[in-house]
Amino acid sequence: MRTFHREARMPESIPASLIIDTLKDTFREARAARAAEGWGPSPHEHLGWILSVPDTHQKTVLAALDKEQAIRVLTCATEDEACTIAAGLHAGGEPVVLMIQHAGLYASVNTLRGVAMDGKVPVFYMIGLLQREKDKDPKESRHSMVRYCEPLLDTFSVPHARLEGPNDVHLIPEYYRLSRQRRGPTAVLVGLETS
C-alpha cells in the first residue's frame, strides 16, 4: 500500500484556478494515454468529467467549473451514483474525477469496494476534509469524520495522499495515474477549503 505522509506543516488553502489547471493537464494526459491504447478521437471537445456530490469544502472549485467549458461537471445525488457513473464513463474511455466530502466516503464504502475494488475500476477521488482543524494532523482531529478518513482508506488498502497546499497539486495527476495503473481506487484528501 502506498500512503504519502510528510512532516507536519501548516496546511494552506489551494486556489480553485490551480486545481482546475491541474485537472485540465491531468485530463489531457489521460486522453493522450487512451489514444496510445488505440481509442479513437473524442467525439466532443471537453477534456474530462468531474462527478460531484454537493461539497462545501471544494465549493470554489465547483463554482469555477460551472464557467469552465473544457471540463464537464455532473452533480450526482449520492456518492454511490457518482462511483457507478464513473465506472461507465471509464468504460467509454472518458477521464473522470470524483469530488466528494469525507461523509460521502463513509456513505459509499460498499460501492467503493464493489465497483472500484472488486470491479477493478480506476476511480480517483478528491475528498474534502470538512471541519479539519488547521493546526492538527487529521488523525488527531476532534471530529471523528476527519479522524477516521485515512484509517478507513488504509483498511481498504486505498492509496491516498494529503493536499496540504499549492505545492501538493502534483499529487492529483500522480494519484490519477496510480488509479489507472492499479485498476482500482485512489484518493487525495483536500485538507482545507479551497480558495
Task: Label every model-predicted segment.
Residues 1-195:
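Thiamine diphosphate
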